[in-house]
Amino acid sequence: MAHGTTRQVLSLITNPIDVICGNLKTVHDMMPDRPDILGAHLEGPFLAMPRKGAHDPNCLVDPTPDLVSRMLDAADGCLRQITIAPELPHGIDAIRRFFLAGVVPAVGHCDADYQTARKGFDAGAGIMTHMFNAMNGLHHRDPGPIPAAVEDPRVTIELINDGFHVQDPMVKLGFGLAPHRIAFVTDAMAATDCPDGHYLLGALDVDVRDGHARLASNGAIAGSTLLLEKAV
């Protein structure tokens, strides 16, 4: 609230399924007394291993029908968005099922080709999770998921506008490719508005230096410390 954000969807990091289901229940139970919390976004565990970013590889799984059912049951209506790599086994079916359950699926953390990404959007995915980050990039002979998103007027495209995740020329390109469909997100983690130092992202150790969060193990970008007012 101090920085002008009056509503939020809480993004939950990849964890074991039992932990994720417990976290969803926690969000559900908080919502009656917290009108600022609109629900949860699951960023994982249905992500592509090559594009996992700062997610725990030991917890990544395929979106089987049983796991989809467990998540929907645990959420009891609080799950608003879920990021899925559409190329995973059961990926397209999971997107369709979440969509029919009232959840907004998002394509992201993926290594999908153009055709598979299109299938994901046709199945109900209405968001691209932080475009340019944690996905295969633009290539003239292998277009990938980005052109599939920008050409589809149904898709809202997220960008992390901190000058670090995405450089300014690429932010401008995003607005040029999909005017009126760009949504700034923070991808913020626990160190947001806090001093540099050591933090945790799920079970993973993160070092924050000069406001930039990276995994201690391999230096991979581990979310951001961005405030939405600064992104705008």
Question: Which sequence ranges carry the predicted segments?
Answer:
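Non-catalytic positions within long, well-ordered alpha-helices that form the structural scaffold/packing
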Residues: 1, 28, 72-75, 99, ...
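Divalent metal-dependent hydrolysis catalytic cores, especially in the metallo-beta-lactamase
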Residues: 1-20, 36-48, 75-87, 103-106, ...
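Active-site glycine- and acidic-residue-rich loops that bind
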Residues: 16-22, 87-89, 105-111, 159-176, ...
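Generic structural signal for well-ordered alpha-helices
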Residues: 21-28, 68, 95, 171
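Charged helix-capping and loop-helix junction motifs
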Residues: 23-26, 64-66, 141-146
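Conserved phosphate-binding/catalytic loop of the ribokinase/pfkB sugar-kinase fold
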Residues: 48-74
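N-terminal active-site wall of soluble small-molecule enzyme domains
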Residues: 69-71, 88-97
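Active-site-adjacent C-terminal substructures of enzyme catalytic domains
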Residues: 94, 116-232
